[in-house]
Amino acid sequence: MKIGITPSIKEIYKNQFEYCVDIRLIDFLKYCFINPKIFIVNESSLNIKNINFLIISGGNDIYDLVKHKKNFLRNQLDNKALNSAIQKKIPVLGICYGAQFISHFFNNKVFKKRGHVQKINKIIIKDKSYLNKNFIKVKCFHNYVIKAHKKLNEIGFCEDKTIEFYKIKNKKIYGMMWHPERDYNFKNFNKMILKRICS
């Protein structure tokens, strides 16, 4: 399995930007797949034709919602990577910000809502073909949420009816609003979800 990850972008000093990938995400992917080859996707390595799976990782905010240069740079990178993955029909998973970015990319509403940061949320599983459970509990870290839309297939949703896990209709593009890599002990249901997405 060859996996590309788009990194978060942080401003470490005035106009000095750092590209970052959480080491826990890399460890989580090693937990899910046997000897994965992991590539960090940036402007100089945007050719993603040799990967089997693209992850738009967490971190940052959508530039249209939070006007900051680091978000502008991130959104530019993710736009190019997602367009390339769509063209080459590579499966994509957006994690947290990545899920919001994909939703926004397909013109679905993303809006600010309290109660989803550092909180354990109960996610009701609507589509059991992805996970044969009625619900799961996950820790969330996001300020923005996603509303239901005709372009999304809801797979799992929160008790406040906001979407936590979805698939773009007619495409192998998914969004997951929680961070599977942030559990101290990786959860097997997250591994099952990734395997299902890549199958």
Regions found by a protein language model. Give the residues of each.
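N-terminal beta1-alpha1 cap of cysteine-dependent amidohydrolase-like domains
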Residues: 1-97, 105, 111, 118-133, ...
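Catalytic His-Asp charge-relay segment
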Residues: 172-176
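DNA-recognition element of transcription regulators
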Residues: 140-144
